[in-house]
Each structure stands twice: as structure tokens, then as C-alpha cells.
Amino acid sequence: MNTAPKQYGFYMPAEWYPHERCWMAWPCHHETWSKIGLDKAKMAYARVAKAIAQFEPVTLLVNPGDEDSATNLCKGHNIEIISLPINDSWTRDTGATFLINNEKQLAGVDWIHNAWGGNYADCSLDNLIASHLIKCTEAQYFHAPLVMEGGSFHVDGEGTILTSKECLLNSNRNPHLSQQEIEQYLINYLGAERIIWLNMGLIGDETDGHIDEIATFIAPGKVLCLITKDKEDPNYHRLQENFEILKSSKDARGRTFEVYTVEQPPATYLNGERLTLSYINFYMANQGIVMPAFGYESFDRLAYQLFVQIFPGYQITQIDALDVFSGGGGIHCITQQQPKSYKLGE
């Protein structure tokens, strides 16, 4: 379908909208997990999948021949396994972006995936994941002629998009498009009205500053952003700038944001490289939040206490996620929610 979803009344709902399920993919890419090895990566993904499965069904995409390891680590936990050839395991970025309309019908956007600006040689199988998910869910299909990853934007479901210039305006994504043209694609394919641009993401983020590491919507008119109090940290000024932008911004409904902050954990290195650790990178499930812990007791505890405060009515589950982040992303990056919907004709 060549026309955009917004024309048909479709929009991406906020992540707190009820979910049908969560989609994940089983680790398989040796280069991605070279710091810790595939076995540890699989155990880390299993922890995330089982934590989410407390709240909603999880469907796990697994490379043919790797079903046994997924079954052994995830069996009996409200987790379905589907065999599908894949290159990597980041469904936030490679899976479909699901939309609904006012009749609660389901649609899916299939973006172009180029492995985060060409970081990896082969992403041909991952470029097919979105269309497979859309077919599996019997959703209405929309192809977007835009290189895009799901971790590069957040929505509030009420007309507002949050994203970063470092990623979306990067010359390794859509160099032929202007900022205005990219904005129009986002508005048309996510069913929105207004875009708030932050500038820079975390130092060393191989995704070029994905928004799901630095800021997110937590409720209508409310955002959570990452900060650091350490003025010597190279992230300090860029995170402070993001905070100031959010404080002075209004959403599509004209509300000035209520801005909450969570402090990033101390700088952590693995094989000489700093990991991009962030408590912002969590998954919001049905009545539950699955958030990371990094082994820093005071930072982990303060983040947990904040989440209890800002997510009333949700059960907060905090899990050891350092191994997930060693691959270059976090809990939000390895998950993709499918909103509850009615099938066409129901």
C-alpha cells in the first residue's frame, strides 16, 4: 500500500496502551555478542522474556536449528517460539511498528532497515522481519520508504513524537531527505501532529543516539529523561541540553511537560569500551514494568524507587540487564509491543 497510515486513521498508540503480546528475537549474531558470548546473551534474553511473560504473552523469533536452546531456557513461561531466519535480535528496530485506528483495527509499518547506518554487512533477513510480523498478525500493511529503527522514536499516542537529530538526521540513514521531509514521513506513518527534537544521544551509542536511551513518555504530558550529576562525564552537557529542551517544550495538545529525571549509572567498561547504560531503556508491559539493574546498588535502588513513584498501579520488576547492554542496546531495544486490536471484519 503506497498511501500513508494517517490517511486511514491509523496511529501508533503509546506504550501504556494495552498489549496483545511482546515480540522478541533470540540472540544469534556472534559479532554482536563477542564481548560476552552467545550463551550468556541467550540467558540474558531469557531473563527479559520470562519477566515480561508475567504480564503478557511473549513471541520469540528463533533461527532454525536454535529452537532447543530457546525452549530449554524459556519453556513453560507464557512464551511462544516461532522459527524464522534472522540476522540479529533487536525487534524494536527490525520488527514492525504496530498501529491502531479508532475501530481498534491493527496495521503495521515496515521501515527500511540498514543495520544502524551500515554497522553490519548483512541485514537482509532482518529486513524481512517486519513484513513477517505484519502477515502473522493479519495487520494492514504499510511500507515506509524511509530508513528507520523503532528505537529512534517514542510516541505519546496523542499526536506527539519524541526523537533525536543525531540519529534521524544522520547522513548514514536518509541523506537525500531534509529534516522537514523526514518530519512529514514520521507524522504520516505514525499518525502524529508534532515532533520534539532532542539533539544528541549517549556517547558511544552505535545506533547514533537512539531516543530510547535518553528520554521517553511515561504518561500523557509526562516524560522521563536521563541525566548525570557528574560534570566531568562526557554525557553531562548533552543530557543537560535534552533536559532543558523537554522543560521548554509542549506536546501536540499544548501541555508543558512534567519532566522527571533518572540518573545514569557510573561509567562502565567492557573490553575497553564504555557501555551505554540507561534506566530509560525499559519495557512497559500490561500492568508491569521490566527495568534494568546494573549492579550499582544505590543507583539501581534509586531508579527502582523512582519507577514505583512514577508508575502507580504497575508492578515494577528489576532484572540484571548488564549482559543485554553489552550487545549495544537494552530491554526496550530487544522488545516490540503489539497493541490489542480487533481483526478486520470483527
Curated annotation (Swiss-Prot):
Catalysed transformations (reactions): agmatine + H2O = N-carbamoylputrescine + NH4(+)
| Single Gene Ontology MF annotation | protein-arginine deiminase activity
* Top enzyme class: hydrolase
Keyword Transcription attached:
no
Kindly identify the residues recorded as the active site: 333
> What's a Pfam family this protein contains?
PAD_porph
- Which keywords, in A-to-Z order, does the entry hold? Hydrolase
Q: Which InterPro entries match?
A: Agmatine_deiminase, Peptidyl-Arg-deiminase_porph
Q: Does the record bear Hydrolase in its keywords?
A: yes
What name appears for this protein in its UniProt entry?
Putative agmatine deiminase
Which species expresses this protein natively?
A: Legionella pneumophila (strain Paris)
Q: Which gene is annotated as encoding this protein in its UniProt record?
A: aguA
